[in-house]
Structures are given as C-alpha cells and as structure tokens.
Amino acid sequence: MSDQIQLIAPDDWHVHLRDGEMLKQVVPYTAQMFRRAIVMPNLRPPVVTVEAAKAYRDQIVAACHPNWGFTPLMTAYLTDDIAPEEIERGFHEGVFTAAKLYPANATTNSAAGVTELRHIHGVLLVMERIGMPLLIHGEVTDVDVDVFDREAVFIERSLKPIRDRYPGLKVVLEHITTEQAVDFVGSADQNLAATITPHHLHINRNAMFAGGLRSDFYCLPVAKRERHRLALRRAAMSGDRRFFLGTDSAPHARPGKESSCGCAGIFNAPHALESYAMAFAQDDKLDKLEAFASLHGPAFYGLPVNEGIVTLQRDDKLVPNVVNGLVPFHAGETLPWRLQPCT
C-alpha cells in the first residue's frame, strides 16, 4: 500500500456549521479540508427565506480566510407553509443549491419541519421542474416505530411515494444508515443518490453502549447493526456514483451533548477525510476514495469538479480528546493518515 495518496480536492455534501461563536470555532475544519460544502439550514430560526440564506452565507464567508478558497452551498429549510415562489427565486438567483426536508421533530432543530408531504406538493412540483435537488432526513417520527427502524419505514412509507409522484425530482437520501437504504438507492435511476458519513462506516450501534452510555456516538439517524455498517462500506467503496461523501458533522457544546438528555450529533469535521481514508484502506479500496469524495457529488449536482489536489500521507495522527471545547469523532484514537494542505 502506498504511503501517500493524492485526490482531486473534495467536497462535503452535508455539514452543520451552526452560527455565531460556534460557527467561528468549527468552520475552519471544513473550509480548510473541502472546497465546497452543502450547509444545513436547521438554525434557530431556520433558514426559510432567500434573505436569511444570504445573511447566513455572509456569516460563513466572513469566518473563512480567503486563501482557503471555500464556497458554502446554501439550502432552504422546508416548512408546511413555505412558498414555492421563494424556493424558485432562491434557486434561480444562485442562493439556494438545494432544499432540505426534515420531517417535523426528526432531529436537531426540526420542530418547524414538514408534518405531511401533501403540504409541500407545490414546492416539490416546482423543484422537479427547475431541477433543484431535494435533500431528505429519511426517518419517520411515529412513537410506535422503533428508533432503529425509522429509516427503513421512511423509505417504504414516504420515499417511495415521493419517487413515484415526482419521478423527475432529484433526491438525496442523506446520511444513510441501513442496508435497505443502500439497496433502494442502488436500484434507482440517476435522480436518486445518498450521502454516507465517516462515523457510520466505523461504528455500529454497540458503540453507544460500550462500557457505559457513550453520548459522543449518539447521532440521528442512530448507528445500526453490524450488517448495516458493512452494507454502507460496500456502497461507499463500490464506485457507484449514486453514493458520495457527506460528513453530517454536527457539533454540540459539551454541556448539551453530555447531559441527561444529550443532543444528537457527531463532530467529525477535524479529521473527516483521514477517517474516510482509514475505512477505505481497511478494505483495500483506497483507489475508490477519490470518486466517492471528489467526483460523484459534483456529477449529481451538475457542478464542475474542483481544481487542485489534496494529499493524504501515511503518518500516525493522535486525535485530541477535545478540540475547541468540543469532543471530536475518534477522540483519543490514532489515525494512520494525515491530511496535507490543499494545493
């Protein structure tokens, strides 16, 4: 195995950058590793207007050094009463790259999300017509559905009807966690894709309970059984262009993360690419990493491939237990790869 690999500069197709002081702390990790990132809109209040997206984009850009060459790609937060005209205007003005569907109360700051798909029928028709991607947090929230089954049930109950009713709509099922999601996306046409996180390639649901209750491994969707983790690895490393990188890095301050009712989210941004590289190397699939990290996403979104390269050097790197007051994924572990600056 080579001691060095070079990749076309990658993108992160799903990240939470937060806002305010938290944004200033976390955005450098993403902006110095990736050239572009799809930024989630679940702020308080959520990003539901073109003006709000512009203001948020300005806040992100202000926190970045110009030499990083980073471009945030903004998304709209869909609600029951969002206007189709606002979505279309934001897309045509180059402000909204995509729109995000959060089922109401499915995850962090999703209380204002969509309660029933019929409420956004007009929006989805417009998005289908103009070629605007729909990004989906694919879980049902019914109390009678087991938390480990919520993604699989969502596919049957909601995603299949969306695909049937809006066949021309471009859809990304984000941060997939199940074999069912892999199979559904893998059997679909070019209008359906999925992002895969680094943590779901490394952990199964046992990680949350290893030696106690491990809140730093709690995210939504939750990690599943080992067979699902292995299915995600096969998908990510298959070379199938329907699967691409999306970290879902989701930082939370430690008091909220480590409380009796801890927040869902894993902060993986500081070492995301090294984490992916470790997984791909473990399965002897490093030759598939560039397509997953740098090529498949732009192809789906209809964007140019980045210029420049990044280099990963085989060199042990100890992950700190805490960075900027946040606990990172792989805290206390040694990663076998080290990212060199983008050129």
Curated annotation (Swiss-Prot):
Main enzyme class: hydrolase
Reaction(s) the record says it catalyses: (S)-dihydroorotate + H2O = N-carbamoyl-L-aspartate + H(+)
Gene3D superfamilies, sorted: Metal-dependent hydrolases
Protein residues bound to Zn(2+) 1: H14, H16, K100, D248
Metabolic or biological pathway, per its Swiss-Prot or TrEMBL entry: Pyrimidine metabolism; UMP biosynthesis via de novo pathway; (S)-dihydroorotate from bicarbonate: step 3/3
Binding positions for substrate per the UniProt entry: H16, L17, R18, N42, H137, L220, H252, A264
Binding site residues for Zn(2+) 2: K100, H137, H175
Top-rank lineage group of the source organism: Bacteria
GO molecular function: dihydroorotase activity; zinc ion binding
HAMAP family (alphabetical): PyrC_classII
Subunit structure of this chain's protein: Homodimer.
Name of the protein: Dihydroorotase
Protein species of origin: Synechococcus sp. (strain CC9902)
Gene: pyrC
